[in-house]
């Protein structure tokens, strides 16, 4: 509730959780923000080695996205770049359906932004031997945090992470020219963030 109260009127909150608490978390967030301020449930899909067991292999977590005020929140559309063929002079081919109902490829002057970002994000977990890895148990990939920050803030906006853990959110906010503030309850998180 306190974090909700501290949000700017055009602010939003993203909450990451896994299958153990996602159902409960959604109910708590609906109570705090109101169901009308729920924006998306994002599925963060990742690939990793799965061991055969008596259930489906777990390969995603949930991220709940809420606005403080649905009518005022910042949302910058993100796009997946098209893999369309491009001509030598920068023009691109797009698929259109004509008046006769037949699909055709047409050369366009406009450079396509791509397809609007869906709510299923395939982003790899951090490589166990990668330079990005800090050995913090709940560390998120910079690509995941970057996508969230770009979608809901503009340059010089303030990004807050009240459970900053490894400090990934703060590092990405700095790279994207955002102001930031972070806190954590654990000494290990604070020392890792430094």
Residue ranges and their predicted role:
Residues 1-192:
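Core catalytic lobe of class I
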């Amino acid at each position: 509730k306190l974090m909700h109260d501290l949000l700017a009127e055009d602010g939003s909150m993203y909450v990451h959780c896994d299958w153990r608490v996602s159902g409960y978390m959604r109910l708590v967030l609906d109570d705090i923000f109101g169901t009308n301020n729920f924006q998306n449930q994002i599925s963060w899909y990742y690939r990793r080695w799965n061991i055969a067991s008596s259930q489906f292999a777990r390969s995603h977590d949930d991220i709940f996205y809420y606005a403080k005020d649905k009518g005022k929140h910042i949302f910058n559309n993100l796009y997946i770049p098209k893999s369309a063929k491009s001509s030598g002079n920068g023009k691109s081919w797009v698929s259109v359906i004509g008046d006769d109902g037949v699909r055709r490829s047409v050369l366009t002057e406009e450079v396509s932004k791509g397809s609007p970002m869906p709510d299923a994000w395939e982003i790899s977990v951090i490589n166990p031997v990668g330079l990005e890895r800090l050995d913090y148990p709940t560390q998120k990939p910079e690509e995941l945090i970057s996508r969230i920050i770009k979608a809901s803030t503009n340059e010089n906006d303030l990004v807050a992470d009240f459970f900053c853990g490894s400090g990934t959110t703060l590092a990405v906010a700095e790279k994207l020219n955002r102001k930031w503030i972070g806190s954590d309850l654990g000494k290990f998180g604070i020392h890792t963030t430094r």
